[in-house]
Amino acid sequence: METQNQIETLRYIFNQLNNQDKPQIIWFSGEGEDEKINFLIRLDNYFQPTFVQDLTINFLPAFVKRNKKNPPNTLAKGNFVNIANKLLAVLARSLSWKQLNKPQQKWLLWLLVPFLLLRQLWLKKKVSKIFQFVNERGILSFIKEQWPILTTLVTVGTTLGTPIFSITISQQKAILENAGHGAFVFLVIFSVFAIALGLVSSLIFLVSSLFSIRQKKSLQQLHQILSRLINKYFCFANSEQNQTGRYQLKNTGVCFFYGFDFEEKEYITQAMNLLLLLKQTNCFVLVGCKESNMLLIKNKVEPDINLKQSSLYLDLKSQISPLAQISKYNLLFEELALDADMFYLEDFFALLKTPRQIVNFLFRIKQNLKEFHQPQTLWFDYLALWALVIATDFEFNNVLWSFNDYLSLTNKQKEDYASVNLTAFFNRSLKNHKDNSLLFKPELFNTHAYIPETYTQVTLENIDSDKRAQLVPLNWFSQQKFSDFIEEKINFWQTQQAENKVFYLTLGERIFFLVLVNKKFKQIKLEAALKYLN
């Protein structure tokens, strides 16, 4: 039976989907918590072509460059040529060609292969031609940018060129007698040039306006064009024949559904391809679904939300797990990096029970932080502080040893985190991967600035590869420095309220406010924390 937590989370998601002014990509589904975290990591790394080599090699550089400057919020900003190619590639893998039945003779199958390839190439060319017109001819932006110049040139031609030319011709004799032949020639050339400039500007504006009207019409009808192509050249499975709207490209308010099986080897590539495609449009994405629970959505959520789109599915087979909530928050990271001044992350760290989960989650956070171009205020819990320290430019081994020696946890916290054996995890990484291990991985922040004497440089010479790899401890001087630093901060923590401890740390140009929340205050709200900091 559904819980209130399920209903509230669904309402949150559908509210995001109905917010057409600020589209969101929301991932919410899947079986297996480790697989969820892994998928999030791949999703965050979609800038790297290693995950989507087959379709996005030429597409990614332009996408990254444009997205970092100004994210694509409208359909007109999309790279339509690549969208067409990606859409056709997705459709070609998931749909069957129309009017083609598999023959019994194997040799006929071989004959059909080149025919299908040629038809697919022809269809790609046809779709790409439509999209190329929209993508490469920036008529709308041209008119908007050049409007003042064109207006000025037309004004010069009409208000100056024509009167001067008329006066010059009518008073030709007087001008020649009083100003000379040179002045007469200058006035004639100037007036003719001004008139010609005005005429050319008028023609440019007229032609641009016509193309602008055509471009606007193309933008408005893109989803209809694709719909006709899909209906003509592709057919759906029997269970999807009445749901072709999912695969249509629209300007606003569309939620795409794409299901995949975590057991399939290609599920990451397939999901990445579709998400990259949809990222270029002003659409919403909901990935991984089950039809069996649509009744819950329609009965419990849709009446309250006034949901406009009906082809939405969520996997509610089990109760919404804490890791699903992590997914919900993390997928908003990119929007926050561009728009928000503050980001609040609940203490999800206690929910990660294995070294694999905890390290994957760290990678997810670090990758997101790289997209922040302005100083941000981030909120984390007590163990997230530990995690961030491990994930930054500190030597991992120094941090782990010092943490065990100088940072104390309550008995309850020890119970919560006892199952996470990070020391063993990093030891294995060091032993198996040597200089490619996590210990030597270049990280995001340079934290040596505020306590430079503390950390010793770990090199491969310190490690005997024939024996069990061990973390190299700090020297005495460095330990004492680190101890003094930690003790100072602990004293600061102890002066705060027991239930809402606050600690801030400056790393480079970024300031991290680390909210230390006890277990029973896990759901502390951002507003309360801000009021407390004042």
Curated annotation (Swiss-Prot):
**Gene Ontology terms: cellular component:** plasma membrane
> Its membrane topology, per UniProt?
Multi-pass membrane protein
Q: Membrane-spanning regions, if any?
A: 149-169, 185-205
Keywords noted in UniProt:
Cell membrane, Membrane, Transmembrane, Transmembrane helix
- Which compartment or compartments is the protein found in? Cell membrane
Q: What is this protein called?
A: Uncharacterized protein MG255 homolog
Q: Which organism is it from?
A: Mycoplasma pneumoniae (strain ATCC 29342 / M129 / Subtype 1) (Mycoplasmoides pneumoniae)
